[in-house]
């Protein structure tokens, strides 16, 4: 969830309004209600397989997977291992998939205010969405950093280096999804 509140559950469930930074999955074929609350509710939604069809309840099916609803206050953050001791390691929350194989996997990445560094990716399809904070990112490989607000998106394919800066007063969180590896390199803070 990027802004506002979202409820995603079966039709008989008690409302559970999840704030920005929350994460949920919804199995294909399951009857569910997705609702938002707030004047500017924005969510990033990934569809695993197209087409995504809204169908009547009598066509529901069980694909064997189960829904996951994780409120932002219950996200489990950990330091990313393998980062040089001189660097501030990113805080990550592994959300889906296995980052050790070549299948798509997603995670949240948290960087402190003042962070400057690189996000290095090598997957065939690399996506990132700003969830909170203000990220500086050069457009089309240029030198000028452009401000990306929550809801902004950047992507690449193959080997790529994304220069990032968390220049606002608050920490920055991005959601990343790739079918390759993700590495981080820090640069000295400009604050």
Regions found by a protein language model. Give the residues of each.
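Ligand-binding loop in jelly-roll beta-barrel domains
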Residues: 13, 28-51, 149, 158-182
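Short, low-complexity cationic-aromatic patches
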Residues: 36, 100-103, 118-126, 165-168
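Glycine- and acidic-residue-biased ligand/ion/polar-headgroup-sensing regions
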Residues: 1-11, 111-141
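Short acidic-glycine-tyrosine-enriched beta hairpin
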Residues: 5-29, 98, 139-160
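Intrinsic, low-complexity N-terminal interaction/targeting segments
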Residues: 104-108
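Histidine-/acidic-rich catalytic cores in large beta-rich domains
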Residues: 11-14, 23-25, 38-42, 51-53, ...
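A short, N-terminal "cap"/entry segment at the start of jelly-roll beta-barrel domains
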Residues: 53-103, 189-191
